[in-house]
Amino acid sequence: MGLSDGEWQLVLNVWGKVEADIPGHGQEVLIRLFKGHPETLEKFDKFKHLKSEDEMKASEDLKKHGATVLTALGGILKKKGQHEAQLKPLAQSHATKHKIPVKYLEFISEVIIQVLQSKHPGDFGADAQGAMGKALELFRNDIAAKYKELGFQG
């Protein structure tokens, strides 16, 4: 299920656009995630009180957390599948501390693709979307395997 060099290049090309505005992209990803899948908001004590999109947009903490999420994901994507060292602590915290189900990682993966489609239509055509989908699936599968090792049934 690995990606070809060409597919990784497509992923990293569009990720360069994300890195030009990590906080903005991260904020939009989290807002779309919380609006589309309100149950995910329950995992974030810091954001549970944010009920409207306007409140979410005004939250500096939400923007910062979105940047943290996408910065971590970018570090993983840049490893082109050789992400064991980056993945282990992430899986550990998401399994044992945050208890984030794999399903929620599927939700955020879908949202990331939607945000990239809306913000970068010229740089995120069908081939790039397919490549990003594969990269995010690889990430999720590897997280799920780590969850299993940790005894988390997420």
From Swiss-Prot:
O2 binds at residue 65. Residues 2-148 form the Globin domain. Keywords: Cytoplasm, Heme, Iron, Metal-binding, Muscle protein, Oxidoreductase, Oxygen transport, Phosphoprotein, Transport. SUPFAM superfamilies: Globin-like. It is found in: Cytoplasm, Sarcoplasm. Heme b binds at residue 94. The keyword Cytoplasm applies. It comes from the Eukaryota. The modification Phosphothreonine is found at residue 68. Its EC number is 1.7.-.-, 1.11.1.-. This is Myoglobin. It comes from Rousettus aegyptiacus. The lineage of its organism: Eukaryota, Metazoa, Chordata, Craniata, Vertebrata.
